Amino acid sequence: MLTFLIPTAKEMMIPKESHPHLLPQDSQAILKIMAAMTTEDLAKSYRIKEEAAKKEQQRWQDMASQQNLAYPAYQLFNGLMYRHIKRDKLTTQEQAYLTQQVYITSSFYGIIPANHPIAEHRHDFHTRIKIEGQSLKSYWRPCYNQFAKEHPQVISLLSSEFDDVFSKDCKQLWISPKFMAEKEGQFKTHSTISKKARGAFLTACMENNCQTVDSLKSLVFAGFYYHPDLSTDHEFVYIKKEA
């Protein structure tokens, strides 16, 4: 069985479905630090303006006082990749695939199933804090490595910020899809192409119930197709021709 890892997103949209917010033990140490930070501290940590930091401060304080709700993560996150993932009117098989084989890597919650209930928050591995004297990446590394040991065959749709959260020896069987546009024989990639394609790729995997590495090579989605000459055992390259 294939396991997919996808990143979080800064952009969020409140869905209809909500739950009480139950925070994992490992996250509580982070919450304690974030909730104690001033608006000025948060602005520096996030590298945002103080006006925007006020909103984030309120979210953390609401979370600390247990006054907020939680929502299925794949529905709450609404960044470009998430908007290109099929999230509504799923078949029973697609729903099972999404909730049992897709996991979200978070610097606040750890690695969680795609439908795990989470609260509105802003947090990533660039957030400048120390937990028990450790960086966020060092703090989460044992948890992330344990997940990797339990799920050796991972399809990683993660961005570069996660490269050194996992130890290298845990990623020997990982495959990272790469998405490129071809125009007049020139190949290019950028974040917009990649984010849209990640969502479309995951949707195609769900719809086709891909369970083997070889099945990924036959996928055609949003104009992309597998390119064997550019691919390696650990990097599957998908090309889309542009007019």
Swiss-Prot record:
- Family per record: Belongs to the UPF0246 family.
Record-annotated disulphide pairs: none
Q: What is this protein called?
A: UPF0246 protein M28_Spy1772
Q: Which InterPro entries match?
A: YaaA (IPR005583)
**Which organism is the protein's source?**
Streptococcus pyogenes serotype M28 (strain MGAS6180)
Give me any GO biological process, just one: response to hydroperoxide
**Do you know which NCBIfam families this protein is assigned to?**
PRK02101.1-4
List cellular component terms (GO).
Answer: cytosol
